[in-house]
Regions:
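N-terminal signal-anchor module of multipass membrane proteins
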Residues: 1-49
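C-terminal transmembrane helix-loop-helix hairpin of multi-pass membrane proteins
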Residues: 1-11, 23, 170-191
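Hydrophobic alpha-helical transmembrane segments and adjacent interfacial helices
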Residues: 21-32, 55, 73-87, 104-109, ...
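Structural signature of hydrophobic alpha-helical transmembrane segments
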Residues: 27-47, 86-102, 144-160
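Glycine/small-residue-rich interface belts in oligomeric ring/scaffold proteins
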Residues: 43-85
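C-terminal ends of transmembrane helices
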Residues: 48-62, 103-118, 163-178
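Cytoplasmic-side transmembrane-helix entry/capping segments in multi-pass membrane proteins
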Residues: 62-73, 92-95, 116-128, 177-188
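Functional transmembrane core segments of multi-pass inner-membrane proteins
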Residues: 140-187
Length: 191
């Protein structure tokens, strides 16, 4: 198998996107006040849609429409479960994740095509459902008095780490971890 070429501009674009995404989430968290949670939930829902799109395109599950539809519905339900209750808790998010997985299983059972790869599709559904529910936990965290500050620190650290890793890949894409991976070990370690 020939080595995959290093795409430096793609690494720079991913670094810029991760930085902008981190800034968007940080500034979105500022919109959440003591009684105002919906604006931040809308920002998080936008990020969840990007997450669903990126992962369904990367994983390419056999039942892509079912997986994507379940994930988008779970994202909306998770945001509602995070923003609407009077007391901030993670319990409702767990129920939403479990219900989303059950709906994903039922969606797979009614399909006749591609049942041979049902475990791949269920694995992708579980991965994406847990991911969108994890993003909704930011809304729950913003409802706790010190949670907003904690989320700012975590989001800033994540955005900086991703940007540094990808910018390092653009400048120093070596030593290669494997010929099929267009990233260098320096970027993985620096990030």
């Amino acid at each position: 198998m020939p080595p995959v070429p290093v795409r430096r501009l793609l690494s720079v674009a991913v670094a810029g996107f991760s930085g902008l995404l981190g800034l968007g989430l940080i500034f979105g968290a500022y919109t959440a006040g003591p009684g105002v949670r919906v604006p931040f939930a809308v920002v998080v829902f936008g990020v969840q849609l990007l997450f669903v799109f990126a992962w369904t395109m990367a994983v390419r599950p056999p039942a892509l429409p079912v997986v994507a539809a379940v994930a988008v519905v779970v994202a909306g339900a998770a945001d509602a479960a995070a923003a609407l209750p009077r007391i901030a808790a993670l319990g409702p998010l767990g129920y939403v994740a479990a219900a989303g997985f059950v709906v994903g299983v039922l969606g797979q059972l009614v399909r006749r095509k591609d049942r041979a790869r049902v475990t791949d599709s269920l694995g992708a559904t579980l991965l994406i459902v847990v991911g969108v529910v994890a993003f909704a936990s930011l809304v729950v965290l913003s409802r706790i008095p010190i949670g907003t500050q904690a989320s700012h620190v975590c989001l800033a650290a994540t955005a900086v780490a991703l940007a540094v890793a990808r910018l390092t890949d653009a400048v120093l894409p070596w030593p290669r971890m494997a010929p099929q991976v267009p990233r260098g070990a320096a970027g993985v370690v620096a990030g």
